[in-house]
């Protein structure tokens, strides 16, 4: 694989197990000349154990139109909404609070997301999760 030249990196967020050729996946991959159905089948097979989770994926397209992809952990905001069973954050986060996040929940989210964050210490990851929660209008205990 080292002799193949990378021609494009495509970053998308796709629900786990639900990739289909409709926008935004189809146009993004079609412009790069990638087999769209081939990607959808591979992605759905790889993420069938995580249905409904919004998963960031980085697709590497090579000069011979082959591809590889890496799935990452869901965004922190999605993990927070899932932990608190929310549809969305507050429209006015500094005034309207929509929930409370405990330190145990913050730690669990930080541990899950830490490998995708550029941090070494768990405390740094927890501070990032707390900041995201505050920007969504969620109090952190």
Curated annotation (Swiss-Prot):
Q: Which domain of life is it from?
A: Bacteria
Q: Name one GO molecular function term.
A: structural constituent of ribosome
What Gene3D superfamilies does UniProt report for this protein, alphabetically?
A: Ribosomal protein L11, C-terminal domain, Ribosomal protein L11/L12, N-terminal domain
PTM summary from the entry reads: One or more lysine residues are methylated.
A biological process (GO) of this protein is: translation
Q: Which SUPFAM superfamilies match?
A: Ribosomal L11/L12e N-terminal domain, Ribosomal protein L11, C-terminal domain
Fetch the CDD domains from UniProt. Answer: Ribosomal_L11
* Keyword Ribonucleoprotein on entry: yes
What are the entry keywords?
A: Methylation, Ribonucleoprotein, Ribosomal protein, RNA-binding, rRNA-binding
The record's Gene Ontology cellular component field reads: cytosolic large ribosomal subunit
Q: Which family does it belong to?
A: Belongs to the universal ribosomal protein uL11 family.
| Oligomeric and partner information | Part of the ribosomal stalk of the 50S ribosomal subunit. Interacts with L10 and the large rRNA to form the base of the stalk. L10 forms an elongated spine to which L12 dimers bind in a sequential fashion forming a multimeric L10(L12)X complex.
Role noted for this protein: Forms part of the ribosomal stalk which helps the ribosome interact with GTP-bound translation factors.
Q: Which NCBIfam families match?
A: L11_bact
Spell out the protein name for this chain.
Large ribosomal subunit protein uL11
| Species of origin | Chlamydia abortus (strain DSM 27085 / S26/3)
Q: Which gene encodes it?
A: rplK
């Amino acid at each position: 694989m080292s002799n193949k030249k990378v021609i494009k990196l495509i970053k998308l967020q796709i629900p786990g197990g639900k990739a289909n050729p409709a926008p935004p996946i189809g146009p993004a991959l079609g412009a790069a000349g990638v087999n769209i159905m081939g990607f959808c089948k591979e992605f759905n097979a790889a993420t069938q154990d995580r249905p409904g989770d919004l998963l960031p994926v980085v697709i590497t397209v090579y000069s011979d139109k082959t591809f590889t992809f890496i799935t990452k952990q869901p965004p922190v905001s999605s993990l927070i909404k899932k932990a608190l069973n929310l549809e969305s954050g507050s429209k006015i986060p500094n005034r309207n609070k929509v929930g409370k996040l405990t330190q145990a929940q913050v730690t669990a989210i930080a541990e899950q997301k830490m490998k995708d964050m550029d941090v070494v210490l768990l405390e740094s990851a927890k501070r990032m999760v707390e900041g995201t929660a505050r920007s969504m209008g969620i109090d952190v205990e």
